[in-house]
Regions:
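Short, Lys/Arg-enriched N-terminal segments with co-localized hydrophobic residues
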Residues: 1-7
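Acidic-enriched and Gly/Ser
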Residues: 7-194
């Protein structure tokens, strides 16, 4: 039986990054907060929020004394075990329980998740609503052509396929078997891992 979702109202000035709120009929996670005091006006809180439904971010302005509905969430650190068509399987490292998460929900995060990696997944009422990836991940290059010798004009790059299947542009000196750092924000190459 479904219990009513735990929601509590707090004053906007007490909002914190990472909290989940209900707003304009949607739910989302607070990514950033900015306190603004325009001229003689009242103080405002500009909250950058990512919608769980659409994945899009937008800025919502609250009066600092305005009440905001906080949704109770459960943040779990889960280890990626394996995937099969349609489902990604994660394990709770403390209880060893496994949980299957729909591939559509995992979305582009699959490009950055490898077996044995621990990531944070946010749940509301037992349903996953958000995957929190680290800003950078280290992945092995499984396929890459040799760079063309003498081609050094304008920082040339070449495509490389990583162990997750993601293709990124890398400098010519990087080779198959290298482990590189990749940005989860823009798929950018950030250097070789030590």
């Amino acid at each position: 039986s479904l219990t009513p979702m735990s929601i509590m109202a707090i004053v906007a000035t007490n909002l914190k990054r990472g909290q989940c709120i209900q707003y304009e009929g949607e739910r989302g996670v607070v990514l950033g907060l900015e306190h603004r005091t325009p001229g003689k006006g009242n103080a405002l809180i500009a909250a950058t929020i990512r919608s769980f439904k659409t994945g899009k971010t937008k800025t919502i302005r609250f009066a600092s004394s305005e009440k905001v509905d906080i949704v109770e969430t459960d943040r779990q650190k889960l280890e990626f075990s394996y995937s099969e068509p349609g489902t990604y399987h994660f394990m709770d490292p403390t209880t060893y329980d496994t949980i299957g998460i729909d591939e559509d929900f995992v979305g582009d995060a699959k490009n950055f998740i490898k077996e044995g990696q621990v990531i944070e997944i946010l749940f509301i009422e037992g349903n996953p609503v958000s995957i929190d990836l680290p800003d950078t991940v280290e992945l092995e290059i499984t396929e890459s052509s040799e760079g063309i010798k003498g081609d050094t004009a304008n920082n040339p790059t070449k495509p490389a396929v990583l162990e997750t299947g993601l293709t990124v542009q890398v400098p010519l000196f990087v080779k198959q078997g290298d482990i590189i750092k990749v940005s989860t924000k823009d798929n950018g190459y950030l250097g070789r891992a030590n």
